[in-house]
Regions:
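Short, conserved beta-strand edge motifs with alternating hydrophobic and charged residues
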Residues: 18-21, 67, 105
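Surface-exposed, charge/polar-rich loops and edge strands
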Residues: 52-65, 74-78, 87-137
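A structured binding-face within diverse protein domains that lines the active/interaction site
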Residues: 48, 68-70
Length: 137
């Protein structure tokens, strides 16, 4: 989304990067290995996503997931866009044998004292803003 903090520089330093795409058939996020330059606007929201034919990435092979959001708290709470894609992805990854770290990426102005949380909402492991990195684990 245009008003989110841009993780492009962070991605540029990664050795290997998996990006999410919305799997509309299964109503979930799927992760594929791709280069940042190869992402193209796709789907109803025109989000930059990898080619659906790109090699799938397994949770066991991913070390860190950058998670977008509208707002965050100092406890790792996150307010997303209401579709639950990241909450379901985080829950699925954490149910496996080895899950990556899930870290929010935002502007400091998006960090609030409190957010409404529901039973299905997943807390993040950390948060990166222009003020630095906070770990919640």
């Amino acid at each position: 989304m245009a008003d989110e903090a841009d993780p492009g520089e962070l991605v540029a330093h990664a050795r290997r990067t998996a990006f999410p795409r919305v799997d509309r058939e299964r109503d979930r996020l799927a992760w594929s290995w791709s280069e940042l330059a190869a992402l193209e606007p796709r789907g109803p929201w025109a989000l930059r996503e990898p080619d659906p034919k790109a090699a799938a990435a397994a949770w066991e092979d991913i070390q860190l997931v950058v998670v977008p959001g509208l707002a965050f708290t100092e406890r790792g709470d996150r307010l997303g866009y209401g579709k639950g894609y990241y909450d379901r992805a985080i829950a699925a990854a954490r149910s496996g044998t080895r899950a990556p770290r899930f870290v929010g990426f935002a502007f400091e102005a998006q960090v609030l004292p409190e957010l409404p949380m529901q039973a299905h909402d997943q807390r993040l492991d950390g948060l990166v803003t222009e003020a630095g990195l906070r770990w919640f684990i």
